[in-house]
Amino acid sequence: MIEMDISKDAFESYSAEDTELGLDLDKVKGVLKLAGSGETIKMEQDDSTGKLVFKVGNITRRMSLIDTTGMNDPKVPQLNLTATIIVPIEELQKGIRAVESISDHITLKAGPEFFELSCEGDTDSVSLKLDNGAAKISTDTDVCSMFPPEYLANIIKAIPGGTQVDIELDNDYPVKLVFALADGAAKVSYLLAPRIESE
């Protein structure tokens, strides 16, 4: 699950009334890929057709909206997770690159003096361990949860370089990853369910 809170200050210009739009995110992703680094994307709703119009340079894309009638708003779980770790995204990205393809799960552990991302397969194992000098750790007890590597990797790889990531963790609970974009004008929160091993 992902939740984004974007203020108008994150945009070069912004004008809108209260409204609800249903978007096909795969189509939106395709439009965003058309933009080069630093290129401006203009997005506006065409009142005559009801479509969302994207302009990227000389390209114009008109996109049909999804009818949201009857769609339930996803409820974001309110979790009070025990451990909070603030770590540079570069450390997480190195750890993910190291553990990929070793096992079908990644273990995240944290204690008062450490944060660890590890993975153990049939023949190989690897871990990234950070102390309080490399990460800001806040927890009174040790916590541990396992997660599917492909989903966690996709989240971590999508976070821009130079970003500080707030990781909230507990025993066999979802992990929450929170980070800011656009000089703090936008906040992104990812929530990933744990992998629970059957006894």
Model-based region annotation:
Residues 1-101, 109-199:
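DNA polymerase sliding clamps and clamp-related checkpoint/processivity subunits
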